[in-house]
Curated annotation (Swiss-Prot):
Belongs to the FAM229 family. This is Protein FAM229A. Pfam families: UPF0731. InterPro entries: FAM229. PANTHER family: PROTEIN FAM229A. Residues 1-96 are annotated as: Disordered. Residues 24-39 have a biased composition (Low complexity).
């Protein structure tokens, strides 16, 4: 092995997160890793309490459910992150777009009487 291919004590490799120290063979590292996990069961596996996949916290809702909220319409955390909206019977998908010349969002296909009832201006817009 060439001396230049072996990292020295002052060199850090990008793929190894371990701090520099005395080199150990893989056979010497296995008992040390097993002892750091705690007691080993008779089957040779770590006890269930030390399983790292079971340590993940459960995904919760981003906002708490308040009075008047319907649990049936509450979105799962996985579906909240998806960019595409899902239309149901109670919450139809309504496309939003920017008004030309301003920064407000407009709803497409809103009937004019609903627009006027919400305080919209009855004058025609210049296009």
């Amino acid at each position: 092995m060439l001396p230049s291919s072996t990292p020295g004590p002052g060199h850090a490799t990008e793929t190894c997160p371990a701090p520099p120290g005395p080199e150990r063979s893989p056979a010497a590292r296995a008992p040390a890793a097993a002892s750091s996990l705690g007691p080993v069961s008779t089957a040779g596996r770590a006890p269930r309490g030390l399983d790292m996949s079971a340590q993940e916290p459960p995904q919760g809702r981003r906002f708490p459910i308040e009075a008047g909220d319907s649990r049936g319409l509450a979105a799962a955390p996985e579906s909240q992150d998806s960019p595409e909206a899902v239309a149901t019977e109670h919450n139809p998908v309504r496309p939003l777009r920017r008004c030309p010349g301003c920064h407000c969002l407009t709803l497409l296909h809103v009937p004019i009487d609903v627009y006027l009832a919400m305080g919209g201006s009855p004058r025609a817009r210049a296009t």
